[in-house]
Amino acid sequence: MLTYQAFIQSPGDTFLNLGFLTIRWYGLLISISVVIGLFISKKLAKSRNINPQYISDILPSLIISSIIGARAYYVIFEWRQYSGSNFFTSFNLFNNVIQIPSFIAIWQGGIAIHGGLIGGFLCILYFCKSKNIHLKTFIDILIPSIILGQSIGRWGNFFNNEAFGIPTDLPWKLFVPIQNRPIEFINYQFFHPTFIYESLWNFLIFILLITIFYKQNNKNSVRPGFISCLYLIGYSFGRFWIEGLRTDPLCIGGLPPFCDGGLRMAQFISIFLFSSGLIGLFFLRLKSYKNKTRNNG
């Protein structure tokens, strides 16, 4: 008797290969995210009386700083992968093979979203100071595009066969080729598609933030920083429990897949960001209350 077993499987990481040019899914998805994010952020900027040109002006430096931050964060916590005999890697430069530091080879994988957020925030902070733009308002404008970009970008993990979870037999299970499986689970075929969980969760947050953004405008109750605080709370809550399923965490004092004897760095950062969001909402509420009291008095 034949039985049908449902599962999902990556078709590979390459979208298009022309010989002289290879376009990979991850890069394509990031490019799509940037274009969509640029369009959305410009519309949101206009609705809050911020010059939309500022979005175009910051975009190149924001992308670069986010990539540097995401890579640096990963390398710091996975330094054992890049030290000693692994410090150099081969790179084909116009048919000449040269040796470069392996931590530069970002195309080989290894970035972390929390590092990207740190790098991006520093870029935004500098930009707002140099242009005399209200920081919290400007971040609120960018946040919906950022979370949508995270939602779209997570599908790059699907095509790369990475960032999946522990073994499972659920109907939506992911088949992972043997070469991509953690050594601890080498005999398992199917795993939690945690990137899908996070992608869907992030998209729901995007819908929520956009809805609240325009409701704030319609009611003339714009509170700079409110959208950012909701993002910190919502994203961190989802990332915390999804991270608990993953087999490739960045660890402090422990080793994957479960950081035994240590701590999952993403969960630690999620707790910090979640708490920061709650504290931010508290102070926004407190400020609003004081303003009402002052006006009524």
From Swiss-Prot:
Family listed: Belongs to the Lgt family.
Pathway connected to this protein: Protein modification; lipoprotein biosynthesis (diacylglyceryl transfer)
UniProt record, GO biological process: lipoprotein biosynthetic process
CC annotations in GO: plasma membrane
Spans traversing the lipid bilayer: 20-40, 58-78, 104-124, 133-153, 194-214, 225-245, 266-286
Cell compartment(s), UniProt: Cell inner membrane
Membrane topology field: Multi-pass membrane protein
Its job: Catalyzes the transfer of the diacylglyceryl group from phosphatidylglycerol to the sulfhydryl group of the N-terminal cysteine of a prolipoprotein, the first step in the formation of mature lipoproteins.
Annotated binding of a 1,2-diacyl-sn-glycero-3-phospho-(1'-sn-glycerol), by residue: 154
Pfam families: LGT
Designated name of the protein: Phosphatidylglycerol--prolipoprotein diacylglyceryl transferase
Entry keywords, A to Z: Cell inner membrane, Cell membrane, Membrane, Transferase, Transmembrane, Transmembrane helix
Name of the gene: lgt
Presence of the UniProt keyword Cytoplasm in the record: no
Any one Gene Ontology molecular-function term assigned to this protein's record: phosphatidylglycerol-prolipoprotein diacylglyceryl transferase activity
EC number(s) recorded for this UniProt protein: 2.5.1.145
Alphabetized PROSITE patterns for the sequence: LGT (PS01311)
